[in-house]
Amino acid sequence: VVTPVQAMLALELEPDFIAPYYTQMCGLGTDGAEVIRLLAETIERKKLRTRVLAANIQDTDQLWQVYRAGAHCATLNPRLVEQALQEPAIPQAVRFFDDAWKEAFGEISLTDCR
């Protein structure tokens, strides 16, 4: 969906997922985060099983905005995933946990724990 009216009409059908296209909404001058917030609040209030799938997320700022607004999940630009996996903190965290594992369990791996 790309407009608030589409979003609320679609929600009336109680779909499994509703996909507000965040980037397109914002490009049309709509506050995409507010639409997601209204959808999430309505779903909660009506106790619906519908999940908000924020679609076409282009950067980490948008990702944080849609999750803060109440999105249950999101579709991401592959470039965003690649960038996130190349953050310097990730290899550091992997080394930290790898070192902690080896200190506690030696060279045994999770696949050895059957």
Question: What are the language-model segments listed below?
Answer:
Residues 3-13, 58-73:
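Catalytic cores of alpha/beta
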Residues 1-2, 22-25, 53-62, 79-81:
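Active-site beta-loop-alpha junctions enriched in small/polar residues
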Residues 30, 34, 58-61, 88, ...:
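Conserved active-site and cofactor/substrate-binding residues in soluble primary-metabolism enzymes
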Residues 1-35, 39:
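Histidine/lysine/aspartate-rich catalytic loop segments that bind and position anionic ligands
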Residues 19, 45-50, 55, 64-75:
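Active-site capping/gating regions of soluble enzymes
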Residues 32-53, 95-110:
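Alpha-helix-loop-beta-strand connector modules within alpha/beta enzyme cores
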Residues 15-28, 70-90:
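Glycine-rich phosphate-binding active-site loops on the catalytic face of alpha/beta enzymes
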